[in-house]
């Protein structure tokens, strides 16, 4: 016997903007008054929606935002004409005019980009501020050792450039005792001394919690704003920002030895009542959660049975036999305050960043 329900939204992603605000304000409290707290809102604010996030943070006094792609920067500019926007992925001859048009600060990552800006300035084609990213150990983006040395030795050759910010990125800030943190700090301090008129930035979310000496003039939190713990083995107090609710769209009784899902990876050891919820790996619920996750209903954990499908997950609802003949629409919590992105990420040996940014576009997003 089974029941099938098809009304209302199949899955709802609730975003608590008040919790976001609390996280931002709590991060600011860890800083000296002279230190600016920017916000990293790349990847559509880590998947939860950059427009409401940016507007909420502006109300909290945030005036500086960081994104990865230029298209993201343009979107933010449409939300506000007054905020300062930095674009991590650099600048080139094809798009420099767009940086001027939208008043975006490019983060230059190579000596070639820096010299290009200098050349444009001499031609009076780019009279705008820039940021320079120096690689101090990440080996990903930024000027390498040779480029950094050349730039420092030849500062007089780039006198036309207005350097708003010098920055680097910590590779191991999520491990507070890793000696790499101190090594990068020392390298960055030496670089910063060569650009005293410019602001300096090193700390991401985890870097804020390391020590005030990592804060410099500007910090760039990302995941911590959204309730994600940036540390591997350290708990910090953050407010949960998201709640993911999925509707039970079908309920059925199965008997002992019946199997569930692709590959028949779950076999019932007893008669059970199972429900099917309308989310799957297409919505960002990783297949590694197959037989390896619980959702919750009325504060009771319900095990995931079998493999995660593209659009569906089957769960054990034997604790709620009254649901079988009920016409009530029932939602279960896939992610909530207790079963949050930090906790469930450990189940599949990943990080909260991946859980959050993977949440798909099919959810109805509700901002509260």
Predicted regions and their residues:
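Active-site anion/phosphate-binding pocket segments in diverse small-molecule metabolic enzymes
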Residues: 2-17, 21, 72, 91-93, ...
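Active-site-proximal beta-alpha core segment in soluble small-molecule metabolic enzymes
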Residues: 4-7, 11-15, 19-22, 35-191, ...
């Amino acid at each position: 016997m089974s029941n099938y329900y098809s009304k209302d939204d199949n899955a709802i992603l609730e975003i608590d903007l008040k919790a976001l605000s609390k996280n931002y304000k709590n991060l600011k409290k860890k800083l000296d008054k002279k230190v600016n707290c920017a916000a990293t809102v790349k990847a559509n604010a880590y998947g939860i929606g950059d427009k409401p996030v940016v507007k909420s943070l502006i109300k909290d006094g945030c005036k500086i935002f960081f994104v990865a792609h230029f298209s993201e920067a343009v979107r933010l500019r449409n939300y506000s004409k007054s905020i300062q926007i930095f674009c991590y992925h650099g600048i080139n001859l094809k798009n420099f005019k767009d940086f001027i048009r939208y008043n975006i600060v490019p983060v230059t990552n190579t000596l070639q980009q820096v010299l290009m800006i200098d050349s444009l300035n001499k031609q009076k084609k780019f009279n705008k501020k820039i940021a320079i990213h120096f690689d101090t150990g990440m080996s990903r983006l930024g000027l390498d050792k040779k480029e950094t040395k050349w730039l420092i030795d030849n500062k007089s050759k780039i006198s036309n450039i207005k350097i708003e910010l010098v920055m680097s990125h910590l590779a191991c800030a999520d491990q507070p005792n890793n000696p790499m943190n101190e090594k990068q700090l020392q390298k960055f301090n030496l670089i910063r001394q060569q650009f005293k008129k410019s602001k300096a930035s090193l700390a991401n979310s985890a870097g804020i919690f390391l020590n005030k000496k990592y804060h410099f003039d500007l910090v760039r939190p990302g995941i911590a704003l959204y309730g994600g713990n940036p540390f591997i083995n350290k708990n910090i107090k953050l407010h949960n920002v998201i709640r993911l609710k999925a509707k039970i769209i079908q309920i059925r009784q199965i008997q002992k030895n019946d199997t569930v899902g692709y590959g028949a990876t779950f076999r019932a050891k007893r008669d059970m009542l199972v429900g099917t919820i309308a989310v799957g790996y297409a919505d960002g619920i990783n297949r590694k959660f197959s037989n390896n996750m619980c959702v919750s209903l009325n504060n009771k954990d319900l095990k995931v049975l079998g493999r995660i499908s593209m659009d569906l997950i089957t769960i054990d609802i034997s604790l709620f036999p009254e649901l079988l003949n009920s016409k009530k629409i029932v939602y279960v919590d896939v992610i909530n305050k207790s079963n949050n992105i930090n906790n469930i990420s450990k189940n599949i040996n990943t990080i909260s960043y991946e859980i959050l940014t993977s949440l798909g576009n099919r959810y109805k997003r509700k901002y509260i």
